[in-house]
């Protein structure tokens, strides 16, 4: 069968830059699914995306769907013929509907009887007859939270659509998509190249767009060019560009013909904390800051323009003029803020509401102060410094700088605390209290900062759960999931052996009588433990491993982590699945026992060699593993327990647990109970799959 190249390009108004790549990838994924569903064979699919277009190029596309044989079953033979052997009306009607006579029908014999059947050949439809509807369906399924209407049309899309091009090799595929008829016309760059031109063949894309339209349609190629050019521009004056990937992607989505330029700002602005300057450059202007080899901010920035200018100096000058007032604002805010100490701003936190039922931010920092001291005492941190950092933790919210540049909260608190002469540990904790801010982010460095970060997160969790405002579905306005995962990461990765129950009880206690949820402690602990599942799955650890540990509900995250790592290692052993199955069998047997399970094994009642051998090993392991369990060395313990595979298998093959003799039965149940309890010291491995 012949293979073809298919192109679809949707020409639009400027697409939302932060969503551009995800829209293009979703378009490609959706179209793959549509082709597969339509049974049209295809090879590679390339996706293209620029501010004013989404496009796909499909290679090795089949000419048509394959022909299929479809079996159409008719009435049962017993119902198809009368007593004289003549076709009934039901048989004739079915045959006529399939374009055959009853005599031409085949017979199908099944265990339920004999049936008339006709095998019809259904010819596949040509690809060109299907592509329009497949493209429309793929576009309709794009993840677009907010649609737009334009002109007098009722059609909706993420942005207005101006051109639609569908080409199968050199043939224009007729289609009417998003209110536009398919045509060969595509649009070039808004200011350079040909504004509109025709494309003759799908194979010309995207080269024709580059040559005639001055558009680099390949998103990844544009991104690579911007990155390489920015790195070279910074290196030219001994600098290193801060090419944050999220900003790099956004800038890539803003331009069709990227041109990288370098500009300067006045050195006097370097007296302002770098974080504030960087916020202005990256957040407001989409510029890339530049640092020297030692990580010190330089008075330069790199930006990307969407046009080749005959006089780049004018564009550079224009961007310098744009950023200067923003940097001047930052300088003014910083100098103004320095006129007051952080501590003097504490009373003003009484005017800021944390949550209506939970009170003000001032009340929150007083709770954080208490809980941070409670935690610091348990992890060997300086209690006074942890409490001081907790009390000052939100004071920078009252500064001009944070009021204008919200993302600088925490870090500006650190700078102002240093200026005020606060202890360095306290100053750093003010910045690190929000760590980790996102998945993979760094953790607080000092123990005092860990105490404040934990106290802040636990206060939010206890408070919001305490008034019954649990996160539902994807709605989590107080970022409780992030707070829980962050707290767990701090405790496990910083090796802080803390008990969640004890921590949450303290966080609840300092709220006094504000909380109405009577089960808040259990709810918060269960919620936090539940976050482990997603966190470990991201590390490639199976859900069954986490569930096996969750079944034991260990409430010390560090201990929980050790158990998960131990069970994950155990799962890789040859004996693991057999012992998991045996534990499940033991669990089922013990579940049927009424009353309290026996634990005392009487040696004189052991009759069979298999039960004697198992009893001996279980008794030896109980003594041997006790210190390992006490030390939390669960991996070593489970590795030793793997040796029970053979005696357990032999026991079940040779011993009748539910013996008629009640004394024998009770003794064997006690043996199995002791066996199971050995494993339950770590996890419920019967849940392993």
From Swiss-Prot:
EC number in record: 6.1.1.14
SMART domains named among the record's database cross-references: DALR_1
Principal EC category: ligase
Keyword Aminoacyl-tRNA synthetase annotated: yes
One GO molecular-function entry: ATP binding
Catalyzed reactions: tRNA(Gly) + glycine + ATP = glycyl-tRNA(Gly) + AMP + diphosphate
UniProt key word tRNA-binding: no
One Pfam match: DALR_1
Keyword annotations: Aminoacyl-tRNA synthetase, ATP-binding, Cytoplasm, Ligase, Nucleotide-binding, Protein biosynthesis
GO cellular component: cytosol
Subcellular location: Cytoplasm
InterPro entries referenced in this protein's UniProt entry, alphabetically: DALR_anticod-bd, Gly-tRNA-synth_bsu, Gly-tRNA-synth_heterodimer
Alphabetical GO biological process terms: arginyl-tRNA aminoacylation; glycyl-tRNA aminoacylation
Family: Belongs to the class-II aminoacyl-tRNA synthetase family.
Subunit structure comment from the entry: Tetramer of two alpha and two beta subunits.
UniProt cross-references to NCBIfam families, sorted A to Z: glyS
Protein known as: Glycine--tRNA ligase beta subunit
């Amino acid at each position: 069968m012949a293979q073809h190249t298919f192109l679809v390009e949707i020409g639009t108004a400027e697409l939302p830059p932060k969503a551009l790549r995800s829209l293009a990838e979703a378009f490609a994924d959706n179209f793959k699914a549509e082709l597969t569903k339509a049974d049209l064979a295809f090879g590679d699919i390339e996706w293209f995306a620029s501010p004013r277009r989404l496009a796909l190029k499909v290679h090795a596309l089949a000419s048509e769907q394959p022909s299929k044989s479809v079996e159409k079953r008719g009435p049962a033979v017993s119902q198809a013929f009368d007593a004289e052997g003549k076709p009934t009306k039901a048989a004739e009607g079915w045959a006529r509907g399939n374009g055959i006579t009853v005599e031409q029908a085949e017979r199908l014999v099944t265990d339920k009887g004999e049936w008339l059947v006709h095998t019809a050949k259904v010819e596949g439809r040509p690809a060109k007859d299907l592509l329009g509807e497949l493209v429309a369906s793929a576009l309709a399924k794009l993840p677009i939270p907010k649609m737009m209407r334009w002109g007098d049309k009722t059609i909706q899309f993420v942005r207005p659509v101006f051109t639609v091009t569908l080409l199968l090799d050199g043939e224009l595929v007729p289609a009417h998509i998003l209110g536009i008829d398919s045509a060969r016309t595509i649009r070039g760059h808004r200011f350079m190249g040909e504004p509109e031109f025709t494309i003759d063949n799908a194979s010309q894309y995207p080269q024709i767009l580059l040559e005639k339209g001055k558009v680099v349609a390949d998103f990844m190629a544009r991104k690579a060019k911007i990155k390489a050019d920015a790195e070279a521009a910074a290196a030219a004056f001994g600098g290193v560009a801060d090419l944050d990937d999220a900003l790099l992607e956004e800038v890539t989505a803003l331009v069709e013909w990227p041109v990288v330029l370098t500009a300067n700002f006045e050195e006097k602005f370097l007296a302002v904390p770098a974080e504030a300057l960087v916020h202005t450059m990256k957040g407001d202007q989409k510029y890339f800051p530049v640092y020297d080899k030692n990580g010190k901010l330089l008075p330069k920035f790199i930006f990307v323009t969407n046009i080749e200018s005959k006089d780049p100096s004018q564009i550079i000058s224009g961007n310098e003029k744009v950023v200067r007032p923003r940097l001047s604002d930052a300088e003014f805010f910083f100098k103004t803020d320095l006129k007051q100490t952080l501590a003097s701003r504490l009373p003003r936190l009484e005017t800021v509401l944390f949550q209506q039922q939970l009170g003000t931010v001032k009340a929150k920092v007083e709770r954080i102060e208490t809980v941070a001291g409670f935690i610091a005492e348990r992890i060997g941190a300086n209690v006074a410094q942890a409490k001081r950092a907790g009390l000052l933790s939100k004071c920078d919210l009252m500064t001009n700088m944070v009021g204008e540049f919200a993302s600088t909260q925490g870090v500006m608190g650190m700078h102002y605390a240093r200026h005020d002469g606060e202890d360095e540990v306290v100053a750093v904790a003010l910045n690190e209290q929000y760590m980790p801010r996102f998945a993979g982010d760094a953790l607080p460095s000092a123990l005092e900062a860990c105490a404040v970060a934990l106290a802040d997160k636990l206060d939010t969790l206890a408070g919001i759960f305490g008034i019954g405002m649990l996160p539902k579905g994807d709605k989590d306005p107080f970022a409780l999931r992030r707070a829980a995962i962050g707290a767990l990461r701090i405790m496990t990765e910083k090796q802080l052996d803390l008990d969640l129950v004890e921590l949450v009880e303290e966080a609840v206690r300092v709220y006094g009588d504000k909380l109405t949820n009577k089960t808040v402690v259990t709810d918060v602990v269960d919620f936090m433990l539940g976050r482990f599942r997603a966190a470990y799955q991201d590390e490639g650890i199976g859900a069954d491993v986490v569930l096996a540990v969750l079944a034991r509900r260990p409430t010390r995250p560090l201990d929980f982590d050790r158990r998960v790592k131990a069970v994950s290692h155990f799962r890789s052993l040859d004996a693991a699945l057999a012992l998991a199955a045996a534990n499940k069998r033991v669990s089922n047997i013990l579940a049927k026992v009424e009353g309290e399970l026996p634990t005392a094994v009487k040696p004189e009642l052991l009759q069979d060699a298999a039960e004697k051998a198992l009893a001996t090993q279980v008794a030896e392991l109980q003594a041997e593993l006790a210190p390992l369990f006490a030390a939390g060395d669960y991996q070593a313990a489970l590795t030793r327990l793997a040796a029970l595979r053979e005696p357990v298998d032999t026991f079940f093959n040779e011993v009748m647990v539910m013996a008629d003799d009640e004394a024998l039965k009770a003794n064997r149940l006690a043996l199995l109970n002791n066996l199971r309890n050995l494993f339950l010291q770590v996890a419920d491995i019967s849940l392993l799959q």
